[in-house]
Amino acid sequence: MNELPKTMKGVWLTGHGELDKLDVRSDIPVPKPTADDVLIRVGAAAVNNTDINTRTAWYSKGDVTSKDASWAGKAIEFPCVQGIDVCGHIVAVGENVSKNRIGERVLVEPCLREVKGKALSKPCFLGSECDGGFAEFV
């Protein structure tokens, strides 16, 4: 396997608002998979209404200062990478994931209902409560 870069290109959302809150960058750190995770090289990502609604603070009725402008009802930490709909190839795996998964084509389920086998009180969504697919890796 080729060594992965330390940084990637992507689009950071820097706050709630219009398109001026999207910042195209080439210095976003590449995520490192933890023990139970995989790292995906993004092949394609679509703009979902969730991406737009999150950016414009629609979930908090347009109050851009609201602390509940996400699916989970908690404040979004900025900057973040949006992109709820994403597919690609697995390029790295955590220590608890079979290396046979590397190279596998995947379509990501964006709704996270559990983390490390424990149910979440509210679901979290890729590109909202955690970084999504508007970057080279997720």
State where each predicted segment sits.
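Eukaryotic N-terminal low-complexity, Ser/Thr- and Lys/Arg-rich leader segments
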Residues: 1-8
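Short, Lys/Arg- and Gly-enriched loop/turn segments at beta-strand edges
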Residues: 113-123
